[in-house]
Amino acid sequence: MKRKLVYVCLLAMVAGGMMSFSYDIPEKQETGGREDRVISFPGAEGHGRYTTGGRGGKVYHVTSLEDDGSQGTLRWALKQNGPKTIVFDVAGTIHLKSELRTGKDHLTIAGQTSPGGICLADYGFSINSNNVIIRFLRFRPGEASGKEPDGLGGCDKKDIMVDHCSVSWSVDECLSVYGMENSTVQWCIGSEALRKATHVKGAHGYGGNWGGHKASYHHNLIAHCESRVPRLGPRPSTLALGECVDIRNNVFYNWAGNGCYGGEDQHVNIVNNYYKPGPATKQASKQVQYRIAKV
């Protein structure tokens, strides 16, 4: 009985010590660090997760599918000054008359607010400003412009979050968001780049260029592209800072030529991705069919 009592006392002392130890851990005194900041939205991950976009700014409503720049169009909303969030009261396809660019810093495009979704067609879309969040949009440039558009592109900016976007039918590359600082591309699809369209080099149709200083690409699907699945492409602006790229939990399917390659002077994590050869891949050499990356 005494031995049992001793064991109980020892357990109580250990438990008490553990409890007192846990309560003695001081709370973090630092404020303003990245850990204390609010993420872009629930589910935002990666190096771009603290992008604020148009938070705290004005809200502009897109009420027209036209692309003439008149009030109520997406092109008009993008030209407005100051932090802004763009929401959609309409659904359907916006047939662009020329390339569309983000234009101004501190921007959120909330495609999920459209009743049935928004598709941008005929020309490419470019991120050419800082602190941008783009969510739930479809990009289908095609070859109608007679040019060589990327579906969704951009480089040399910082604080970028692209989430739940679908990009297809590009002439050059589907999804080329690279050379950014603090960026994330997540839960997106880049597929069916046009192999024989209006590109000056002839057969083309690539997946995209990926890279940047603190750049994350996760939970994306890249499928049915000739090459650059993806191309790890450094930019002079981010090489100076140090290219640090994290590529994980993506699916790469049915590449025809090269799959993933490049990576010059980059530090790249390639983790837990799924590679599945498809009908087009079977026409390539055995080396290309089962190669994860050529760097």
Question: Where does each model-flagged region fall?
Answer:
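Right-handed parallel beta-helix
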Residues: H106, G111-Q112, N130-P141, K158-W169, ...
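Bacterial Sec-dependent signal peptides at the C-terminal "C-region" and cleavage site
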Residues: A15-G32
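Acidic Gly/Asp/Thr-rich repetitive segments characteristic of extracellular carbohydrate-active
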Residues: I39-I86
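Extracellular beta-strand/beta-solenoid scaffold signature
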Residues: A121-F125, S145-G154, W169-V177, T198-G212, ...
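Acidic glycine-/aspartate-rich tracts in secreted/extracellular proteins
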Residues: E66-D67, A91-T93, S114-P115, G278-T281
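Positively charged n-region of N-terminal signal peptides that target proteins for export
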Residues: M1-K4
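Charged/polar low-complexity intrinsically disordered regions
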Residues: G257-C260, Q266-V271, P277-V295
